[in-house]
Amino acid sequence: MPADDPGAANGSDGGAVSGVPTGPKLITTRFDQADGYTYDGYVRSGGYEALRRALTAMTPDAVHDQVKTSEIQGRGGAGFPAGVKWGFLPDGVFPRYIVVNGDESEPGTYKDRMLMELDPHQLIEGVVLASYAVGAAQAFLYVRGEMALAQERIAQALNDAYANNLVGTNILGTDFSVDIHLSWGAGAYIVGEETALIESLEGERGMPRLKPPFFPAAKGLYLQPTIVNNVETLSNLPWIINHSGQDFYDLASPTSTGMRMFAVSGHVNAPGVFEVPNGTTTFRDLVEAPEYCGGVRNGRSVKAFIPGGASAIWFFPEHLDLPLDKATVDQAGSMLGSGAIVVMDDTTDMVAACWRVVRFFARESCGKCTPCREGTTWLERILKRMLDGNGRPEDLATLVDVCESISPGLAWPPKQTTICPLGPSAVSPIVSAVERFRHEFDHYVEHGRPIDGVERHAIHGTSGVAVHV
Amino acid sequence: MSRLSDHHVIVANDIIARCPRPKSALIPVLHLAQEQDGYVSTDAMEHIAELIGITPAEVYGTASFYEMFKFEPVGKYCINVCTNISCQLLGAWELLEHAEERLGIKSGSTTTDGMFTIEDVECIAACTEAPALQVNYRYRYRVTNEDFDALVDDLRNGALDDEIPPHGTLARVRQTTPDNWADTGRRAQEAVDAR
């Protein structure tokens, strides 16, 4: 049981032995540096050079242009190009805000926490660069409530950055000023949805706002123009400014640019977080290559895998050779989402796996929209009674029917009867598992137990949260 | 049980002053109350309402939405076992079962001596380190049953006091308001609000 010491991400540069695509580390370079999270450690390894360069030698538009040229796609889940998003800000409307989404909670996702714990100054530098580019005088850094170490490291980094005139009034002697205010949540997955995050920042219950407006760039925090960016997205900005948007664009495929962090968990020999060439690396590379996960545990085979977080449609062995490319994965009927790959081997009980993901959404539904609040709860109950051996012959049809009410047509990308995508996300695991492993559900209903040869879990918890209303 | 201490009022007012609108300070200030008492008391919520200039009902309305806020005392150590998909695949339920047996309580409850609370929680962003848990939001990775037993022993005999503060304390480093706080965002927003 290693102590509270996040493992280092493994880069793909150097020592490639199996012909996987390689590239430089952009944002994980300090993960192996013992003092990489401190001000001194950051500056010693080239930190804040991009900020100095931008503020003294580049106009805000020039910084924005570099980000546009890089075509960096947002790393939070939707994959929307950051430079385009910034362009949605209405001209001449101030104040405007930058909000950093550090509410990493999508099951399978583990990379923003690493970036916040191990390189907080890199994120802060990215926030100041973004604020300069769009003309924001205040930025909010919202960290997930459960991440105590990330909050500590960022608080210390902000105090040091202020003391060294890298944030605050007249940064580095220029006439640019911006404040960064550290805030944090208190346990609610839905706050990762950007309008819910804004509600939470305003001190409200974290419920998504009705759309339109579709982008907070029009009306966001305090109904002012607001850009919400993910931690990983902003952490890339110092590299882009130190090199160029074109350099970033040239690293990988034209439809998924730059390097990107992926967390691979589940039934692999060496689970880990890897910064790899985006768009050219394949799922199989990550799962099988010795420099990454080194294959499925115990020499077994892949039964299914989640390609982009719990909200994604599942993939199967025939998808392993797809590249980690947004356009390709979208076209294949799922998404790369938040860079979270969960591998399930051939001993996995698919009904149990499906139930666990659905339980997550049922528990995290904010309750604002009826189809999601009621629907996810019923989906969870039906799946749980199957697992408990009390499944009914009509249950499978009921599951699909409830799914239809949340996401009509069960298409991808999902249609929704809800304000935000949380409800439809609970449909993904059911559509995936029922379509492919219908016999496993039928077997549960008929025999009250899983098919032979799958691992059983000691599932017994309900919603075991202490003394909560 | 109590209102915020004088010290916590100073910290709270500092946070409130940094926000363009006072209510934005609500969640961080609720955490202060939980840090003081280990949970969020009714008195503290009334006090927070006064400090921010909203009603106690608004404070409770927000607080009750978020899972981390407790409205009754919990254990000195809250042990949160992740059972989400990556952890389930690698034995989280078995770990939770062991934790319940070892402490003699069910998930969601607290030992009679007030030392430990167990919760089964959703993904804590440590998926590659499954099965994972948090003690008062400090991580433990790839936890075996033996690891769990050693953890409980260490918590009981104080060996982890430096690393793991009592429940309620999150970050032990706070952002301070420096002399060069620009305050342009707040002033601009106040001008907008005044229109």
Go through each PLM region and give its residues.
Chain A
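Short amphipathic, charge-patterned alpha-helical segments
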Residues: 126-130, 279-297
